[in-house]
């Protein structure tokens, strides 16, 4: 009967009205995110362990987005995101490349160090222009550190100590964990010196796709919630790393990597 049918629709409407809806739910948001990263020791390991992967899971999975972690060389990781074959790459600097999207929030900082022979003068941030520098291909520190003049990009970290020993470079530039790993490969670490240079904020860089745009909105919302609540602090503590949001982390130089 018509009046009974109307009551049925009314009952259905009332039932739907009381179904709880997550505050951060979006009907068109993906239920997974494909994240790609270079393999960094203790940060983004190939087996899915590390500080970086733990941060990503805490950011996305409580919001219903499953993290799919993938490890690739850095330049390939960037290319996958630029082509929309992955949703974001881990460890980007602000405005690093064109054609991808950057959130408002950073999630960590890169503590950048110089590795040199201990017998050589100690470098400073403002004397880098007088040294021959080396770093991993694709990192492009010339856009984020001041007064860079002479530099060479290397494909692998393994020959770095040999390059310094044979004066093929004066300084090797990298993040602190990677330099620590390099020094573990020598029986004479006292022959080398590490010098702090700068702290550069780290971002996810998202694909310029509908998925990427939706996931970027979620990332910024979740970062605001987690920093305010302090829920990221125990993750940094578990990996014995400083909590980046206690500091004022401003890159020495910003701008588009070319």
Positions of the model-derived regions?
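Periplasmic-binding protein-like
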Residues: 37-38, 109-112, 184-220, 243-257
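Short beta-strand-to-loop elements that line the ligand-binding cleft
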Residues: 66-73, 149-156, 160-163, 194
């Amino acid at each position: 009967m018509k009046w009974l049918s109307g009551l049925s629709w009314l009952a259905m409407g009332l039932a739907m009205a009381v179904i709880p809806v997550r505050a951060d739910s979006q009907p068109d948001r993906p239920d997974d995110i494909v994240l790609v990263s270079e393999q960094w020791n203790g940060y983004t390991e190939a087996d899915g362990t590390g500080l970086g992967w733990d941060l990503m899971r805490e950011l996305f999975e409580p919001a219903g987005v499953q993290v799919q972690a993938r490890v690739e060389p850095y330049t390939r990781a960037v290319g996958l995101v630029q082509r929309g074959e992955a949703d974001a790459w881990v460890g980007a600097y602000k405005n690093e490349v064109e054609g991808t999207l950057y959130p408002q929030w950073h999630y960590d900082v890169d503590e950048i160090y110089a590795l040199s022979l201990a017998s050589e003068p100690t470098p400073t941030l403002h004397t880098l222009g007088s040294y021959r520098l080396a770093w991993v291909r694709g990192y492009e520190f010339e856009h984020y550190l001041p007064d860079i003049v002479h530099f060479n990009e290397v494909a692998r970290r393994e020959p770095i100590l040999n390059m310094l020993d044979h004066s093929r470079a004066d300084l090797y530039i990298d993040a602190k964990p990677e330099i620590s790993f390099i020094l573990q490969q020598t029986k004479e670490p006292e022959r080398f010196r590490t010098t702090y240079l700068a702290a550069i904020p780290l971002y996810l860089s998202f694909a310029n796709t509908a998925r990427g745009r939706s996931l970027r909105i979620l990332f910024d919302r979740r970062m605001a919630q987690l920093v305010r609540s302090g829920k990221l602090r125990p993750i940094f503590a578990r990996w014995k790393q400083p909590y980046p949001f206690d500091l004022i982390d401003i890159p020495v130089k910003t701008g588009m990597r070319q």
